[in-house]
Amino acid sequence: MKIAFSIFWIFITVGSMSAQSISQTIELAETSFEIGQYDEAASFYKRVLFFDKSGDFDSLTVEGLAWSSYLSGDYDVSAKYFKTLTRMKEGEGYELMEILSLVKLDDFLNAKRSVLAYRPDNEIGEQNKQIIKSLIDFYLGDYAKAKEGFLKLDASPDQLNEVFRSVDKVNKKTKMKAILLSAVFPGTGQAYSRHYKEGINSLITISAFGAAYVFTITNYGLVVGLISVSPWFQRYYVGGMNSAADLLEEYKAEQFDQLYNRLVSEYAGMIQVNFE
């Protein structure tokens, strides 16, 4: 009975939605968009796409859905519909917005494929392509190519050089050095990546087990020490080295994210999107 009622309710709901005027729904979508309710606007545009079988409103609806999805942060949907718009309308702006949606999704591999296929026909378009391509190259770790691309823009060479000096500094830190430091003196491997609290904790823990090991073999003999304390000491000693390596990778990722965001702040404002 409950299942039958649910199905009945679904049919009533669908029927009432399909009876609603398409033009009225578009008006609701546009009103929602104008007042900044982008999620609601996207919902109305989706409804029009679903129920309008004539296709008369496709161009308007797809564009509205693409923009409202982008502005609401639903970049997966905006990428899809900006791509659709590139086939429906002339102009490079929609292709560029598709690429920006992919970047917002952190889908940098597909974004790079799209930006390499992007063929602008004016100087502004070429600059847009160079900015986005350089940002993508940086995020993907191709720092030499990214720097080469940014230098072509001739925007802020001093700040750019500062960013890439920081890149070189971070890249000099290696997992092997973090492990060796931790092996020689517990805690220094963590401090190497500026995780000082973790380094102190590692030093205290391993020192405690080391002291317990010495105390045990002194009072109860080598065999008892090896059996009871040594496995724990080795576990935390080796664990400290592994932790130092992992924390270094985490530190480097954080540093590169910060540097990437600095580049975005510097260059993203130079992107100009034209839909004429």
Q: Model-predicted segments: where are they?
A:
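Bacterial Sec-dependent N-terminal signal peptides
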Residues: 1-26
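Residue-level marker of positions within ordered structural domains that often coincide
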Residues: 6, 17, 34, 212, ...
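General structural signal for secondary-structure boundaries
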Residues: 18, 121, 155-157, 173-175, ...
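Alpha-helical protein-protein interaction scaffolds
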Residues: 22-169
